[in-house]
Amino acid sequence: MPKIIENLKDRLLTEAKQQIEESGYGAMTIRSIAKGCGVGVGTVYNYFPSKDDLIAELLLEDWKGCIQAIGAASSGSDAPRPVVRCMYEQLTGYVRRHEKIFYDEAAAAAFAGSVSRYDGLLRGQLAQPLRRFCGDEFTAEFIAESLLTWTMAGKDFDRIYQILEKLF
């Protein structure tokens, strides 16, 4: 009878995050995750079909927290600036927490196809809290995409908002 390991999925994700921080995306493997958690390779594959699926889950779990924080900022504000500021802070924090993935050439190559699939979803999630401040759907999505692009490019919030505020 197989042994039951409490919170194994969380342990696998924690181990992956730790290995990425210490050694980078390229050095982390399903085998190294299994070894770090004291389980067989097949056990890891029961939870994650591939290394990239494991990484995607790691990123998704953190992103859910970002979306919750943005939602809270949105529901507590009658003006767009605090909401956009929260989005900016969540995006910069997210990238900083996962820079070993985002700025790794092997990871970029592995995830190149996924980026286009998730771009619309990401833009839509960021546009959602902006819709009530905008006159139409396109403007909310345009602001979301602009904020995402310029935040990822390392631009200062005040400079970005100076332009975006003209669209509200």
PLM region descriptions:
Residues 27, 50-55:
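Short amphipathic alpha-helical segment with a characteristic S/N-K-E followed by hydrophobic residues
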Residues 29, 100-105:
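Short, hydrophobic secondary-structure boundary micro-motifs
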Residues 1-23, 27-36:
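Basic, helix-initiating cap at the start of DNA-binding domains
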Residues 57, 61, 71-96:
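Hydrophobic alpha-helical connector segments
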Residues 31, 42, 52:
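Residues within the helices of the helix-turn-helix
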Residues 86, 94-97, 110-141, 155-159:
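Amphipathic alpha-helical packing segments from all-alpha helical-bundle domains
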Residues 6, 10, 14, 18, ...:
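Generic detection of well-ordered alpha-helical segments
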Residues 37-48:
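Short hydrophobic/aromatic patch on the recognition helix
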